[in-house]
């Protein structure tokens, strides 16, 4: 049975997709904000997915899902990552609150770096992190994953060919090798 965690889950769409499209998978989704968390609960209940566990909490807090540390096969995340000077171009982003979009620093990588660090403690050795990011953050996100000691680091394109996804593996020892500072 695979264990998947969706950090910064928002409405729960990614966690729901994983839970409904795969077999023998337990999925945990974490969301900090009240409104999206309530929506994720409604979506889970509407779809009727018993293997999707929702937790309201800070995705970067070591206490959140601490019982899963070192036991997760895949962490997926679409964290707030938009750089401070960048306006989201997707029409659906216009309805999102500021806290769901912007990454907490001028280049937008502060929150993604913290999420990557937390993901590393959740992952089992060899587990995989998949994270959405801005195309402008490709080099920075690769560097962050490398600083954490992750391996098999790659960025993947979206359907338009823009490199927007980080893929990285937890090393055999899942303790971060360096502190990531922004």
Question: Residue spans of the language-model regions?
Answer:
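Conserved SAM/SAH cofactor-binding pocket of Class I
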Residues: 1-87, 114
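Glycine- and other small-residue-rich loops at beta-strand/loop junctions that grip anionic moieties
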Residues: 7, 104, 157
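Short strand-connecting beta-turns/loops that link adjacent beta-strands
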Residues: 10, 160-161, 173
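Short, well-ordered coil/turn elements that cap or connect secondary structure elements
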Residues: 22, 49, 69, 96, ...
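Short strand-turn motif at the edge of the Rossmann-like AdoMet-binding core
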Residues: 32, 80, 105, 133-135
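Mobile active-site "lid"/loop adjacent to the S-adenosyl-L-methionine
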Residues: 80-111
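Conserved Class I SAM-dependent methyltransferase catalytic core
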Residues: 108-168
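C-terminal lobe and adjacent flexible extensions of AdoMet/dcAdoMet transferase-like proteins
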Residues: 165-182
């Amino acid at each position: 049975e695979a264990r998947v965690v969706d950090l910064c889950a928002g409405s729960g769409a990614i966690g729901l997709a994983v839970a409904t499209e795969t077999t023998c998978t337990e999925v945990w989704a974490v969301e900090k904000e009240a409104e999206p968390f309530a929506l994720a609960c409604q979506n889970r209940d509407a779809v009727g997915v018993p293997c999707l566990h929702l937790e309201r909490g800070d995705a970067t807090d070591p206490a959140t899902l601490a019982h899963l540390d070192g036991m997760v096969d895949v962490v997926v995340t679409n964290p707030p990552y938009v750089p401070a000077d960048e306006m989201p171009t997707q029409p659906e982003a216009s309805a999102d609150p500021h806290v769901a979009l912007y990454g907490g620093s001028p280049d937008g990588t502060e929150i993604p770096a913290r999420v990557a660090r937390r993901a590393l403690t959740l992952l089992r050795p060899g587990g995989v992190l998949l994270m959405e990011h801005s195309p402008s953050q490709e080099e920075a996100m690769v560097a962050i994953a490398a600083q954490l000691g992750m391996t098999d680091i790659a960025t993947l394109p979206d359907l338009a060919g823009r490199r927007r996804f980080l893929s990285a593996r937890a090393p055999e020892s899942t303790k971060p090798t360096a502190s990531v500072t922004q």
